UniProtKB/Swiss-Prot annotation:
It comes from Antonospora locustae. Belongs to the dUTPase family. Its cofactor is Mg(2+). Pfam families: dUTPase (PF00692). This is Deoxyuridine 5'-triphosphate nucleotidohydrolase. Involved in nucleotide metabolism via production of dUMP, the immediate precursor of thymidine nucleotides, and decreases the intracellular concentration of dUTP so that uracil cannot be incorporated into DNA. GO terms for molecular function: dUTP diphosphatase activity; magnesium ion binding.
């Protein structure tokens, strides 16, 4: 049985988050207002929805890759903690040279719900070696 995340429209014409492809990890978030984000401007945009996240997960808001790539738009990650109810807003910054126009109903960000680790952390004096070791950031190459 899957978790239930409850969503309330704050306005009858607000759009609830939707996954646009089968198996997608993220739900798209829609702007509830028309606005313009000027170059080098940061703005908070309402979505018109409120979400309650179950105790077993957290919701995190991310950029949509296409907007980031095409328009130099960055979304600052807003977190909705376990058991928290929050009006969903998108904290957006325009790194581009042109104004970024947002129309009501545009998909401006995405939210991912992440299952939480419920275990305990234990401090140790040494860590076991792993196959990957301390490698990361590009250590596996591109081919």
């Amino acid at each position: 049985m899957s978790e239930i995340i409850t969503v309330k429209r704050l306005f009858s014409d607000a759009k609830i988050p939707v996954r646009h492809s089968e198996g997608a990890a993220a739900y798209d978030l829609y702007a509830y207002e028309d606005t313009v984000v000027a170059p080098n401007e940061r703005k908070v945009i309402a979505t018109g929805v409120r979400i309650t996240v179950p105790l077993s997960c957290q919701g995190t808001i991310y950029s949509r890759s296409g907007l980031a790539l095409k328009y130099c738009i960055e979304i600052f990650g807003v977190n909705i903690g376990p058991g928290e109810t929050k009006d969903i807003v998108v904290d957006i910054y325009n790194h581009g040279k042109m104004p970024f126009n947002v129309a009501k109903g545009d998909r401006i960000a995405q939210i991912v719900f992440i299952k939480l680790f419920g275990g305990d952390l234990h401090e140790v004096s040494e860590l076991s070696d792993t196959k990957r070791g301390s490698c990361g950031w590009g250590s596996t190459g591109i081919s």
